[in-house]
Curated annotation (Swiss-Prot):
Pfam families: ANAPC8, TPR_11, TPR_8. Residues 129-166 are annotated as: Disordered. Keywords: Cell cycle, Cell division, Mitosis, Nucleus, Repeat, TPR repeat, Ubl conjugation pathway. It is found in: Nucleus. TPR repeats lie at residues 66-99, 160-193, 291-324, 359-392, 393-426, 428-460, 461-494, 496-528. This is Anaphase-promoting complex subunit 8. InterPro entries: APC8, TPR-like_helical_dom_sf, TPR_rpt. GO terms for cellular component: anaphase-promoting complex. The gene is anapc8. Pathway: Protein modification; protein ubiquitination. Coiled coil: none annotated. The APC/C is composed of at least 13 subunits that stay tightly associated throughout the cell cycle: anapc1, anapc2, anapc3, anapc4, anapc5, anapc6, anapc7, anapc8, anapc10, anapc11, cdc20, cdc26 and cdh1. Component of the anaphase promoting complex/cyclosome (APC/C), a cell cycle-regulated E3 ubiquitin-protein ligase complex that controls progression through mitosis and the G1 phase of the cell cycle. Belongs to the APC8/CDC23 family. It comes from Dictyostelium discoideum (Social amoeba).
Length: 592
Protein backbone atom coordinates (compact mmCIF):
# COMPACT_ATOMS: atom_id res chain seq x y z
CA UNK A 1 0.00 0.00 0.00
CA UNK A 2 2.70 2.50 1.02
CA UNK A 3 4.72 1.50 -2.06
CA UNK A 4 1.91 2.78 -4.31
CA UNK A 5 1.91 6.09 -2.45
CA UNK A 6 5.70 6.39 -2.78
CA UNK A 7 5.59 5.61 -6.51
CA UNK A 8 2.90 8.23 -7.11
CA UNK A 9 4.75 10.93 -5.14
CA UNK A 10 7.97 10.13 -7.00
CA UNK A 11 6.18 10.14 -10.36
CA UNK A 12 4.71 13.60 -9.71
CA UNK A 13 8.24 14.99 -9.24
CA UNK A 14 9.70 13.08 -12.19
CA UNK A 15 6.91 13.99 -14.61
CA UNK A 16 6.75 17.61 -13.55
CA UNK A 17 10.52 18.03 -13.92
CA UNK A 18 10.19 16.88 -17.56
CA UNK A 19 7.21 19.10 -18.41
CA UNK A 20 4.77 16.16 -18.69
CA UNK A 21 2.08 18.13 -16.93
CA UNK A 22 -0.97 16.04 -17.86
CA UNK A 23 0.66 12.89 -16.53
CA UNK A 24 1.81 14.74 -13.42
CA UNK A 25 -1.75 15.97 -12.86
CA UNK A 26 -3.08 12.42 -13.29
CA UNK A 27 -0.62 11.05 -10.71
CA UNK A 28 -1.55 13.87 -8.32
CA UNK A 29 -5.24 13.02 -8.67
CA UNK A 30 -4.60 9.34 -7.93
CA UNK A 31 -2.39 10.22 -4.95
CA UNK A 32 -5.19 12.31 -3.47
CA UNK A 33 -7.65 9.59 -4.45
CA UNK A 34 -5.99 6.99 -2.21
CA UNK A 35 -7.94 5.80 0.81
CA UNK A 36 -7.66 8.03 3.92
CA UNK A 37 -5.90 5.23 5.82
CA UNK A 38 -3.07 5.04 3.27
CA UNK A 39 -2.74 8.83 3.05
CA UNK A 40 -2.67 9.21 6.85
CA UNK A 41 0.18 6.71 7.26
CA UNK A 42 3.43 8.74 7.61
CA UNK A 43 6.44 7.91 5.46
CA UNK A 44 9.58 6.54 7.09
CA UNK A 45 12.96 8.25 6.65
CA UNK A 46 14.04 5.54 4.20
CA UNK A 47 10.87 6.05 2.13
CA UNK A 48 11.38 9.81 2.04
CA UNK A 49 14.97 9.31 0.91
CA UNK A 50 13.88 6.91 -1.85
CA UNK A 51 11.53 9.59 -3.23
CA UNK A 52 14.20 12.28 -3.66
CA UNK A 53 17.01 9.97 -4.82
CA UNK A 54 17.65 9.81 -8.59
CA UNK A 55 19.74 7.44 -10.75
CA UNK A 56 23.17 8.93 -11.48
CA UNK A 57 22.57 8.83 -15.24
CA UNK A 58 19.19 10.60 -15.03
CA UNK A 59 19.60 14.02 -13.36
CA UNK A 60 22.56 16.38 -13.10
CA UNK A 61 23.81 16.69 -9.50
CA UNK A 62 22.75 19.79 -7.58
CA UNK A 63 25.49 22.42 -7.83
CA UNK A 64 26.78 21.28 -11.22
CA UNK A 65 26.82 23.56 -14.28
CA UNK A 66 24.31 21.32 -16.08
CA UNK A 67 21.95 21.58 -13.11
CA UNK A 68 22.00 25.38 -13.28
CA UNK A 69 21.29 25.25 -17.01
CA UNK A 70 18.47 22.78 -16.45
CA UNK A 71 16.82 25.05 -13.83
CA UNK A 72 16.93 28.01 -16.25
CA UNK A 73 15.66 25.90 -19.15
CA UNK A 74 12.79 24.50 -17.07
CA UNK A 75 11.66 28.04 -16.23
CA UNK A 76 11.68 28.93 -19.93
CA UNK A 77 9.72 25.74 -20.62
CA UNK A 78 7.09 26.60 -18.01
CA UNK A 79 6.70 30.03 -19.64
CA UNK A 80 6.26 28.26 -23.03
CA UNK A 81 9.49 29.75 -24.41
CA UNK A 82 10.40 26.43 -25.97
CA UNK A 83 13.15 27.68 -28.30
CA UNK A 84 15.02 29.40 -25.45
CA UNK A 85 14.66 26.24 -23.36
CA UNK A 86 16.16 24.14 -26.14
CA UNK A 87 19.01 26.63 -26.73
CA UNK A 88 20.06 26.62 -23.05
CA UNK A 89 20.36 22.80 -23.05
CA UNK A 90 22.07 22.50 -26.44
CA UNK A 91 25.35 21.15 -24.96
CA UNK A 92 23.81 19.14 -22.08
CA UNK A 93 24.24 15.56 -23.29
CA UNK A 94 25.51 13.77 -20.18
CA UNK A 95 22.26 13.34 -18.24
CA UNK A 96 18.92 12.07 -19.49
CA UNK A 97 16.69 14.67 -17.79
CA UNK A 98 18.08 17.69 -19.72
CA UNK A 99 18.22 15.62 -22.93
CA UNK A 100 14.51 14.83 -22.60
CA UNK A 101 13.54 18.42 -21.77
CA UNK A 102 15.56 19.78 -24.71
CA UNK A 103 13.98 17.27 -27.09
CA UNK A 104 10.47 17.81 -25.79
CA UNK A 105 10.86 21.60 -25.97
CA UNK A 106 12.04 21.34 -29.59
CA UNK A 107 9.10 19.07 -30.45
CA UNK A 108 6.60 21.47 -28.85
CA UNK A 109 8.19 24.44 -30.64
CA UNK A 110 7.72 22.66 -34.00
CA UNK A 111 4.10 21.84 -33.13
CA UNK A 112 3.43 25.39 -31.94
CA UNK A 113 4.80 26.82 -35.20
CA UNK A 114 2.71 24.35 -37.22
CA UNK A 115 -0.48 25.44 -35.41
CA UNK A 116 0.41 29.10 -35.95
CA UNK A 117 0.90 28.41 -39.67
CA UNK A 118 -2.56 26.84 -39.87
CA UNK A 119 -4.11 29.89 -38.18
CA UNK A 120 -2.22 32.21 -40.57
CA UNK A 121 -3.36 30.21 -43.61
CA UNK A 122 -6.97 30.36 -42.46
CA UNK A 123 -6.69 34.13 -41.91
CA UNK A 124 -5.16 34.55 -45.39
CA UNK A 125 -7.93 32.51 -46.99
CA UNK A 126 -10.56 34.66 -45.28
CA UNK A 127 -8.74 37.81 -46.39
CA UNK A 128 -8.55 36.57 -49.99
CA UNK A 129 -12.26 35.75 -49.96
CA UNK A 130 -13.08 39.23 -48.66
CA UNK A 131 -10.84 40.83 -51.30
CA UNK A 132 -12.50 38.78 -54.03
CA UNK A 133 -15.92 39.92 -52.85
CA UNK A 134 -14.80 43.56 -52.72
CA UNK A 135 -13.31 43.33 -56.21
CA UNK A 136 -16.53 41.83 -57.53
CA UNK A 137 -18.51 44.73 -56.07
CA UNK A 138 -16.10 47.34 -57.45
CA UNK A 139 -15.88 45.72 -60.89
CA UNK A 140 -18.91 47.63 -62.18
CA UNK A 141 -17.42 51.01 -61.16
CA UNK A 142 -13.72 50.61 -61.98
CA UNK A 143 -12.07 50.27 -65.37
CA UNK A 144 -10.96 46.89 -66.70
CA UNK A 145 -7.27 47.95 -66.62
CA UNK A 146 -7.40 48.82 -62.92
CA UNK A 147 -8.91 45.42 -62.20
CA UNK A 148 -6.00 43.74 -63.98
CA UNK A 149 -3.43 45.74 -61.99
CA UNK A 150 -5.11 44.87 -58.69
CA UNK A 151 -5.19 41.18 -59.59
CA UNK A 152 -1.47 41.21 -60.43
CA UNK A 153 -0.51 42.89 -57.13
CA UNK A 154 -2.65 40.49 -55.09
CA UNK A 155 -1.22 37.47 -56.92
CA UNK A 156 2.36 38.66 -56.23
CA UNK A 157 1.58 39.04 -52.51
CA UNK A 158 -0.03 35.60 -52.42
CA UNK A 159 2.98 34.00 -54.16
CA UNK A 160 5.39 35.58 -51.65
CA UNK A 161 3.31 34.38 -48.70
CA UNK A 162 3.12 30.86 -50.14
CA UNK A 163 6.91 30.78 -50.69
CA UNK A 164 7.52 31.88 -47.08
CA UNK A 165 5.13 29.23 -45.76
CA UNK A 166 6.75 26.55 -47.92
CA UNK A 167 10.21 27.52 -46.65
CA UNK A 168 9.02 27.34 -43.03
CA UNK A 169 7.52 23.88 -43.62
CA UNK A 170 10.82 22.63 -45.10
CA UNK A 171 12.77 23.95 -42.09
CA UNK A 172 10.34 22.35 -39.63
CA UNK A 173 10.51 19.06 -41.51
CA UNK A 174 14.32 19.07 -41.46
CA UNK A 175 14.35 19.88 -37.74
CA UNK A 176 11.96 17.01 -37.03
CA UNK A 177 14.06 14.62 -39.14
CA UNK A 178 17.20 15.55 -37.18
CA UNK A 179 15.37 14.92 -33.91
CA UNK A 180 14.04 11.59 -35.16
CA UNK A 181 17.45 10.44 -36.46
CA UNK A 182 19.08 11.32 -33.12
CA UNK A 183 16.61 9.14 -31.20
CA UNK A 184 16.68 6.34 -33.74
CA UNK A 185 20.46 6.13 -33.44
CA UNK A 186 20.27 6.37 -29.64
CA UNK A 187 17.73 3.52 -29.55
CA UNK A 188 19.76 1.25 -31.84
CA UNK A 189 23.11 1.85 -30.14
CA UNK A 190 22.14 2.43 -26.51
CA UNK A 191 18.61 1.13 -25.89
CA UNK A 192 19.44 -0.51 -22.55
CA UNK A 193 20.58 2.78 -21.01
CA UNK A 194 17.56 4.80 -22.22
CA UNK A 195 15.16 5.51 -19.37
CA UNK A 196 11.37 5.21 -19.64
CA UNK A 197 11.00 8.88 -20.55
CA UNK A 198 13.42 8.87 -23.49
CA UNK A 199 11.71 5.72 -24.77
CA UNK A 200 8.34 7.45 -24.40
CA UNK A 201 9.56 10.44 -26.39
CA UNK A 202 10.94 8.16 -29.12
CA UNK A 203 7.50 6.53 -29.36
CA UNK A 204 5.97 10.00 -29.89
CA UNK A 205 8.30 10.55 -32.85
CA UNK A 206 7.48 7.11 -34.24
CA UNK A 207 3.77 7.92 -34.02
CA UNK A 208 4.38 11.10 -36.01
CA UNK A 209 6.17 8.97 -38.60
CA UNK A 210 3.12 6.65 -38.57
CA UNK A 211 5.27 3.67 -37.61
CA UNK A 212 2.62 2.44 -35.16
CA UNK A 213 3.97 -1.10 -34.71
CA UNK A 214 7.40 0.13 -33.63
CA UNK A 215 5.83 2.88 -31.50
CA UNK A 216 3.79 0.27 -29.62
CA UNK A 217 6.90 -1.88 -29.05
CA UNK A 218 8.84 1.11 -27.67
CA UNK A 219 5.92 2.16 -25.44
CA UNK A 220 5.80 -1.31 -23.87
CA UNK A 221 9.52 -0.98 -23.11
CA UNK A 222 8.83 2.49 -21.67
CA UNK A 223 6.09 1.36 -19.24
CA UNK A 224 8.29 -1.53 -18.11
CA UNK A 225 11.08 0.89 -17.20
CA UNK A 226 8.79 3.58 -15.78
CA UNK A 227 5.20 2.40 -15.12
CA UNK A 228 3.86 5.62 -13.53
CA UNK A 229 3.69 7.67 -16.73
CA UNK A 230 -0.02 7.79 -17.61
CA UNK A 231 0.65 9.47 -20.99
CA UNK A 232 2.62 6.39 -22.09
CA UNK A 233 -0.26 4.07 -21.13
CA UNK A 234 -2.78 6.35 -22.84
CA UNK A 235 -0.74 6.37 -26.06
CA UNK A 236 -0.37 2.60 -25.87
CA UNK A 237 -4.15 2.29 -25.67
CA UNK A 238 -4.56 4.36 -28.84
CA UNK A 239 -2.03 2.15 -30.67
CA UNK A 240 -3.68 -1.15 -29.81
CA UNK A 241 -6.11 -2.56 -32.35
CA UNK A 242 -9.85 -2.64 -31.78
CA UNK A 243 -9.76 -5.97 -29.98
CA UNK A 244 -9.14 -6.84 -26.35
CA UNK A 245 -7.34 -10.01 -27.51
CA UNK A 246 -4.22 -8.04 -28.43
CA UNK A 247 -3.76 -7.00 -24.79
CA UNK A 248 -3.36 -10.65 -23.82
CA UNK A 249 -0.45 -10.89 -26.27
CA UNK A 250 1.37 -7.83 -24.90
CA UNK A 251 4.03 -8.25 -22.24
CA UNK A 252 2.83 -5.64 -19.73
CA UNK A 253 4.31 -5.04 -16.27
CA UNK A 254 2.48 -6.50 -13.28
CA UNK A 255 1.70 -3.12 -11.76
CA UNK A 256 -1.33 -1.23 -10.45
CA UNK A 257 -1.06 1.06 -13.51
CA UNK A 258 -1.89 -1.94 -15.68
CA UNK A 259 -5.37 -2.07 -14.09
CA UNK A 260 -5.97 1.60 -14.91
CA UNK A 261 -4.79 0.93 -18.47
CA UNK A 262 -7.07 -2.09 -18.94
CA UNK A 263 -10.09 -0.22 -17.58
CA UNK A 264 -9.37 2.75 -19.87
CA UNK A 265 -8.78 0.52 -22.91
CA UNK A 266 -11.97 -1.48 -22.37
CA UNK A 267 -13.95 1.75 -21.97
CA UNK A 268 -12.51 2.91 -25.31
CA UNK A 269 -13.62 -0.37 -26.90
CA UNK A 270 -17.14 0.10 -25.47
CA UNK A 271 -16.65 -2.97 -23.25
CA UNK A 272 -18.26 -0.89 -20.57
CA UNK A 273 -19.33 -3.57 -18.10
CA UNK A 274 -15.84 -5.10 -17.98
CA UNK A 275 -14.30 -1.65 -17.57
CA UNK A 276 -16.67 -0.76 -14.72
CA UNK A 277 -15.78 -3.98 -12.88
CA UNK A 278 -12.07 -3.00 -12.89
CA UNK A 279 -12.83 0.55 -11.74
CA UNK A 280 -15.03 -0.80 -8.93
CA UNK A 281 -12.22 -3.08 -7.75
CA UNK A 282 -9.75 -0.17 -7.75
CA UNK A 283 -12.13 2.15 -5.89
CA UNK A 284 -13.03 -0.46 -3.28
CA UNK A 285 -9.48 -1.43 -2.39
CA UNK A 286 -7.05 1.45 -2.89
CA UNK A 287 -8.40 4.53 -4.65
CA UNK A 288 -11.54 5.09 -2.63
CA UNK A 289 -11.50 8.89 -3.14
CA UNK A 290 -10.40 9.06 -6.79
CA UNK A 291 -12.41 11.61 -8.77
CA UNK A 292 -10.84 10.20 -11.95
CA UNK A 293 -12.40 6.78 -11.28
CA UNK A 294 -15.71 8.45 -10.40
CA UNK A 295 -15.68 10.35 -13.72
CA UNK A 296 -14.77 7.23 -15.73
CA UNK A 297 -17.53 5.25 -13.99
CA UNK A 298 -20.03 7.99 -14.90
CA UNK A 299 -18.85 7.86 -18.54
CA UNK A 300 -19.19 4.06 -18.54
CA UNK A 301 -22.79 4.32 -17.37
CA UNK A 302 -23.45 7.00 -20.00
CA UNK A 303 -22.11 4.62 -22.67
CA UNK A 304 -24.43 1.91 -21.32
CA UNK A 305 -27.32 4.39 -21.60
CA UNK A 306 -27.87 4.12 -17.84
CA UNK A 307 -28.47 7.86 -17.81
CA UNK A 308 -30.01 8.04 -14.34
CA UNK A 309 -26.92 6.43 -12.74
CA UNK A 310 -24.57 8.51 -14.91
CA UNK A 311 -26.35 11.72 -13.90
CA UNK A 312 -26.17 10.80 -10.22
CA UNK A 313 -22.43 10.07 -10.46
CA UNK A 314 -21.71 13.35 -12.27
CA UNK A 315 -23.68 15.26 -9.64
CA UNK A 316 -21.53 13.62 -6.96
CA UNK A 317 -18.41 14.57 -8.94
CA UNK A 318 -19.51 18.22 -9.15
CA UNK A 319 -20.16 18.23 -5.39
CA UNK A 320 -16.56 17.10 -4.82
CA UNK A 321 -15.10 19.46 -7.44
CA UNK A 322 -17.50 22.38 -7.99
CA UNK A 323 -15.20 24.14 -10.49
CA UNK A 324 -14.39 21.07 -12.56
CA UNK A 325 -15.00 21.22 -16.33
CA UNK A 326 -13.11 18.10 -17.44
CA UNK A 327 -15.65 15.45 -18.61
CA UNK A 328 -18.57 17.73 -17.65
CA UNK A 329 -19.50 18.02 -21.34
CA UNK A 330 -20.49 14.33 -21.07
CA UNK A 331 -22.77 15.30 -18.18
CA UNK A 332 -24.36 17.90 -20.47
CA UNK A 333 -24.98 15.11 -23.02
CA UNK A 334 -26.91 13.18 -20.36
CA UNK A 335 -29.00 16.25 -19.49
CA UNK A 336 -29.62 16.76 -23.22
CA UNK A 337 -30.80 13.18 -23.75
CA UNK A 338 -33.04 13.38 -20.65
CA UNK A 339 -34.51 16.67 -21.93
CA UNK A 340 -33.58 18.58 -18.75
CA UNK A 341 -33.54 22.13 -20.08
CA UNK A 342 -33.46 23.85 -16.68
CA UNK A 343 -30.54 21.73 -15.40
CA UNK A 344 -28.63 22.18 -18.66
CA UNK A 345 -29.22 25.95 -18.54
CA UNK A 346 -27.86 26.12 -14.97
CA UNK A 347 -24.84 24.02 -15.97
CA UNK A 348 -24.13 26.29 -18.96
CA UNK A 349 -24.27 29.44 -16.80
CA UNK A 350 -22.00 27.82 -14.21
CA UNK A 351 -19.47 26.74 -16.85
CA UNK A 352 -19.39 30.30 -18.23
CA UNK A 353 -18.50 31.62 -14.78
CA UNK A 354 -15.77 29.00 -14.25
CA UNK A 355 -14.00 29.46 -17.61
CA UNK A 356 -15.67 31.15 -20.54
CA UNK A 357 -13.14 30.28 -23.24
CA UNK A 358 -12.82 26.55 -22.69
CA UNK A 359 -13.81 23.77 -25.16
CA UNK A 360 -15.93 21.99 -22.53
CA UNK A 361 -17.83 25.21 -21.75
CA UNK A 362 -18.52 25.83 -25.44
CA UNK A 363 -19.82 22.27 -25.87
CA UNK A 364 -22.11 22.57 -22.84
CA UNK A 365 -23.58 25.83 -24.19
CA UNK A 366 -23.85 24.26 -27.66
CA UNK A 367 -25.85 21.37 -26.19
CA UNK A 368 -28.13 23.86 -24.43
CA UNK A 369 -28.93 25.70 -27.68
CA UNK A 370 -29.36 22.39 -29.51
CA UNK A 371 -31.95 21.29 -26.94
CA UNK A 372 -33.77 24.60 -27.56
CA UNK A 373 -33.67 23.75 -31.31
CA UNK A 374 -31.53 26.85 -31.97
CA UNK A 375 -29.16 24.94 -34.23
CA UNK A 376 -27.32 27.97 -35.68
CA UNK A 377 -26.28 29.12 -32.20
CA UNK A 378 -25.33 25.55 -31.26
CA UNK A 379 -23.09 25.31 -34.34
CA UNK A 380 -21.47 28.65 -33.45
CA UNK A 381 -20.47 27.40 -29.98
CA UNK A 382 -19.21 24.05 -31.26
CA UNK A 383 -17.08 25.97 -33.78
CA UNK A 384 -15.69 28.05 -30.90
CA UNK A 385 -14.77 24.85 -29.09
CA UNK A 386 -12.88 23.67 -32.18
CA UNK A 387 -11.04 26.98 -32.50
CA UNK A 388 -9.85 26.48 -28.93
CA UNK A 389 -8.91 22.84 -29.58
CA UNK A 390 -9.13 21.50 -33.13
CA UNK A 391 -8.68 17.91 -31.88
CA UNK A 392 -11.60 18.07 -29.46
CA UNK A 393 -13.49 14.91 -30.42
CA UNK A 394 -16.85 15.68 -28.78
CA UNK A 395 -17.13 19.01 -30.60
CA UNK A 396 -16.58 17.42 -34.04
CA UNK A 397 -19.22 14.77 -33.38
CA UNK A 398 -21.74 17.22 -31.91
CA UNK A 399 -21.31 19.77 -34.69
CA UNK A 400 -21.85 16.91 -37.15
CA UNK A 401 -25.19 16.17 -35.45
CA UNK A 402 -26.18 19.84 -35.74
CA UNK A 403 -25.29 20.03 -39.44
CA UNK A 404 -27.37 16.89 -39.93
CA UNK A 405 -30.32 18.57 -38.18
CA UNK A 406 -30.26 21.50 -40.62
CA UNK A 407 -29.69 19.09 -43.57
CA UNK A 408 -26.20 20.48 -44.36
CA UNK A 409 -24.97 17.05 -45.39
CA UNK A 410 -21.55 18.01 -46.80
CA UNK A 411 -20.60 19.88 -43.61
CA UNK A 412 -21.87 16.97 -41.49
CA UNK A 413 -19.77 14.48 -43.46
CA UNK A 414 -16.67 16.67 -43.06
CA UNK A 415 -17.23 16.95 -39.28
CA UNK A 416 -17.77 13.22 -38.79
CA UNK A 417 -14.70 12.41 -40.89
CA UNK A 418 -12.61 14.72 -38.71
CA UNK A 419 -13.92 12.89 -35.62
CA UNK A 420 -13.02 9.51 -37.13
CA UNK A 421 -9.51 10.76 -38.01
CA UNK A 422 -8.98 11.81 -34.38
CA UNK A 423 -10.41 8.62 -32.90
CA UNK A 424 -11.34 5.72 -35.22
CA UNK A 425 -13.11 4.09 -32.24
CA UNK A 426 -15.75 6.81 -32.02
CA UNK A 427 -18.87 4.85 -32.96
CA UNK A 428 -21.02 8.01 -32.87
CA UNK A 429 -19.06 9.49 -35.78
CA UNK A 430 -19.36 6.29 -37.85
CA UNK A 431 -23.08 6.16 -37.06
CA UNK A 432 -23.42 9.83 -38.03
CA UNK A 433 -21.71 9.16 -41.38
CA UNK A 434 -24.20 6.36 -41.98
CA UNK A 435 -27.09 8.73 -41.32
CA UNK A 436 -25.72 11.38 -43.69
CA UNK A 437 -25.43 8.91 -46.56
CA UNK A 438 -28.94 7.70 -45.76
CA UNK A 439 -30.15 11.25 -46.41
CA UNK A 440 -28.28 11.17 -49.73
CA UNK A 441 -30.08 7.91 -50.63
CA UNK A 442 -26.77 6.01 -50.89
CA UNK A 443 -27.61 2.84 -48.94
CA UNK A 444 -24.40 0.92 -49.71
CA UNK A 445 -22.22 3.74 -48.37
CA UNK A 446 -24.56 4.09 -45.43
CA UNK A 447 -24.41 0.36 -44.76
CA UNK A 448 -20.58 0.42 -44.74
CA UNK A 449 -20.53 3.05 -41.98
CA UNK A 450 -23.31 1.44 -39.95
CA UNK A 451 -21.41 -1.88 -40.05
CA UNK A 452 -18.35 -0.03 -38.70
CA UNK A 453 -20.54 1.24 -35.86
CA UNK A 454 -21.84 -2.29 -35.11
CA UNK A 455 -18.25 -3.57 -34.96
CA UNK A 456 -17.32 -0.91 -32.40
CA UNK A 457 -20.55 -1.21 -30.42
CA UNK A 458 -21.97 -4.71 -30.99
CA UNK A 459 -24.31 -4.52 -27.98
CA UNK A 460 -26.12 -1.35 -29.09
CA UNK A 461 -29.48 -2.16 -30.75
CA UNK A 462 -29.56 1.23 -32.51
CA UNK A 463 -26.52 0.29 -34.61
CA UNK A 464 -28.11 -3.01 -35.68
CA UNK A 465 -31.46 -1.36 -36.45
CA UNK A 466 -29.69 1.18 -38.66
CA UNK A 467 -27.82 -1.57 -40.55
CA UNK A 468 -31.05 -3.57 -40.82
CA UNK A 469 -32.80 -0.56 -42.34
CA UNK A 470 -30.14 -0.36 -45.07
CA UNK A 471 -30.45 -4.05 -45.90
CA UNK A 472 -34.23 -3.62 -46.00
CA UNK A 473 -33.88 -0.66 -48.38
CA UNK A 474 -31.79 -2.70 -50.85
CA UNK A 475 -34.22 -5.64 -50.43
CA UNK A 476 -31.77 -8.02 -48.78
CA UNK A 477 -34.41 -9.27 -46.36
CA UNK A 478 -32.51 -12.23 -44.76
CA UNK A 479 -29.60 -9.91 -43.76
CA UNK A 480 -32.07 -7.30 -42.51
CA UNK A 481 -33.77 -9.93 -40.34
CA UNK A 482 -30.42 -10.99 -38.86
CA UNK A 483 -29.61 -7.37 -37.95
CA UNK A 484 -33.00 -6.79 -36.35
CA UNK A 485 -32.66 -10.06 -34.41
CA UNK A 486 -29.29 -8.87 -33.06
CA UNK A 487 -30.96 -5.63 -32.03
CA UNK A 488 -33.76 -7.53 -30.29
CA UNK A 489 -31.25 -9.76 -28.47
CA UNK A 490 -29.62 -6.62 -27.04
CA UNK A 491 -32.78 -5.12 -25.53
CA UNK A 492 -34.11 -2.68 -28.11
CA UNK A 493 -35.82 -0.12 -25.88
CA UNK A 494 -37.53 1.68 -28.76
CA UNK A 495 -38.95 -1.66 -30.01
CA UNK A 496 -38.03 -0.81 -33.60
CA UNK A 497 -36.60 -4.28 -34.13
CA UNK A 498 -39.69 -6.22 -32.90
CA UNK A 499 -42.02 -4.31 -35.19
CA UNK A 500 -39.67 -4.67 -38.16
CA UNK A 501 -39.18 -8.40 -37.57
CA UNK A 502 -42.94 -8.97 -37.41
CA UNK A 503 -43.48 -7.17 -40.73
CA UNK A 504 -40.52 -8.77 -42.51
CA UNK A 505 -41.51 -12.28 -41.46
CA UNK A 506 -45.05 -11.48 -42.61
CA UNK A 507 -43.61 -10.28 -45.93
CA UNK A 508 -41.74 -13.55 -46.53
CA UNK A 509 -44.84 -15.47 -45.34
CA UNK A 510 -43.23 -16.99 -42.26
CA UNK A 511 -46.46 -16.42 -40.36
CA UNK A 512 -45.50 -18.30 -37.20
CA UNK A 513 -42.44 -16.11 -36.63
CA UNK A 514 -44.45 -13.03 -37.57
CA UNK A 515 -47.13 -13.97 -35.02
CA UNK A 516 -44.45 -14.48 -32.35
CA UNK A 517 -43.04 -10.96 -32.83
CA UNK A 518 -46.45 -9.32 -33.23
CA UNK A 519 -47.55 -10.87 -29.91
CA UNK A 520 -44.32 -9.76 -28.25
CA UNK A 521 -44.73 -6.21 -29.53
CA UNK A 522 -48.39 -6.17 -28.46
CA UNK A 523 -47.41 -7.28 -24.96
CA UNK A 524 -44.87 -4.43 -24.57
CA UNK A 525 -47.32 -1.88 -25.97
CA UNK A 526 -49.98 -3.02 -23.49
CA UNK A 527 -47.48 -2.85 -20.63
CA UNK A 528 -46.44 0.68 -21.54
CA UNK A 529 -50.02 1.71 -22.48
CA UNK A 530 -48.97 2.72 -25.98
CA UNK A 531 -51.55 3.11 -28.73
CA UNK A 532 -51.12 3.57 -32.46
CA UNK A 533 -50.94 1.98 -35.89
CA UNK A 534 -48.50 -0.73 -34.80
CA UNK A 535 -51.15 -2.01 -32.33
CA UNK A 536 -53.77 -2.12 -35.10
CA UNK A 537 -51.37 -3.96 -37.46
CA UNK A 538 -50.53 -6.51 -34.76
CA UNK A 539 -54.18 -7.13 -33.79
CA UNK A 540 -55.27 -7.52 -37.41
CA UNK A 541 -52.50 -9.97 -38.29
CA UNK A 542 -53.04 -12.04 -35.13
CA UNK A 543 -56.81 -12.10 -35.66
CA UNK A 544 -56.30 -13.52 -39.17
CA UNK A 545 -53.53 -15.88 -38.04
CA UNK A 546 -55.54 -17.47 -35.23
CA UNK A 547 -58.97 -17.64 -36.90
CA UNK A 548 -58.23 -21.15 -38.18
CA UNK A 549 -56.22 -22.29 -35.13
CA UNK A 550 -57.59 -20.71 -32.00
CA UNK A 551 -60.91 -19.03 -32.66
CA UNK A 552 -61.30 -17.79 -29.09
CA UNK A 553 -57.98 -15.94 -29.27
CA UNK A 554 -58.81 -14.58 -32.72
CA UNK A 555 -62.14 -13.35 -31.38
CA UNK A 556 -60.37 -11.47 -28.58
CA UNK A 557 -58.12 -9.66 -31.05
CA UNK A 558 -61.13 -8.78 -33.21
CA UNK A 559 -63.03 -7.37 -30.23
CA UNK A 560 -60.08 -5.09 -29.49
CA UNK A 561 -60.06 -3.93 -33.12
CA UNK A 562 -63.70 -2.85 -32.81
CA UNK A 563 -62.51 0.00 -30.58
CA UNK A 564 -60.71 1.56 -33.55
CA UNK A 565 -62.20 3.45 -36.48
CA UNK A 566 -61.25 2.75 -40.07
CA UNK A 567 -61.11 -0.21 -42.45
CA UNK A 568 -59.55 -2.46 -39.79
CA UNK A 569 -62.77 -2.29 -37.78
CA UNK A 570 -64.79 -3.56 -40.74
CA UNK A 571 -62.26 -6.31 -41.37
CA UNK A 572 -62.53 -7.36 -37.71
CA UNK A 573 -66.31 -7.57 -38.07
CA UNK A 574 -65.87 -9.72 -41.16
CA UNK A 575 -63.51 -12.08 -39.29
CA UNK A 576 -65.98 -12.32 -36.39
CA UNK A 577 -68.81 -13.21 -38.79
CA UNK A 578 -66.59 -15.85 -40.37
CA UNK A 579 -65.72 -17.31 -36.94
CA UNK A 580 -69.38 -17.37 -35.86
CA UNK A 581 -70.52 -19.02 -39.10
CA UNK A 582 -67.81 -21.67 -38.73
CA UNK A 583 -68.80 -22.35 -35.14
CA UNK A 584 -72.47 -22.74 -36.19
CA UNK A 585 -71.54 -25.18 -38.94
CA UNK A 586 -69.37 -27.21 -36.60
CA UNK A 587 -72.15 -27.38 -33.99
CA UNK A 588 -74.66 -28.59 -36.63
CA UNK A 589 -72.29 -31.27 -37.89
CA UNK A 590 -71.87 -32.76 -34.40
CA UNK A 591 -73.95 -35.99 -33.79
CA UNK A 592 -76.89 -35.51 -31.44
Amino acid sequence: MSQIKIELIKSINDLNSRGLLLSSKWSSEQLNGLSPTILATPLTNEEQLSIISQPSISSPPIGSNEYYKYILAKNYFDLKEYRRCSDVLIDCNKYQLPIFLRSYATYLAIEKRREEDIIEQQAQQQQQQQQAQQQAQQAQQESQQNDKNNDTNNNNKTDQQQQQQQQQKIEQCQEFKQLFQFYKKLYIENKKDMDGFLLYFYSMLLKKQRDFTMARKVLIESVHKYPCNWSAWSDLSSLCSDSADIIMQLSLPDHFMKDFFLAHFKLELQQNNESLVIYQQLSRTLFTQSTYILAQTAIGNYNLRAYDIGEELFERLIELEPNRLENIDIYSNILYVRDKKASLSMLAHKAMKIEKYCPETCCIIGNYYSLKLEHDKAILYFQRALKLNDRYLSAWTLIGHEFLEIKNVSAAINAYRKAVDINPRDYRAWYGLGQTYQLLKLPLYSLYYFKKATTLRPYDPRMWCAAGGCYEFIERIPEAIKCYERAEENYDRERVAINKLAKLYQEIQNNEKAAFYYKKNLYYCDQEKIDGQEIIDALLFLANFYKNQNQTQSEQYCLRLLDYAGPEKEEAKSILREIHSKSKLSSKSKPK
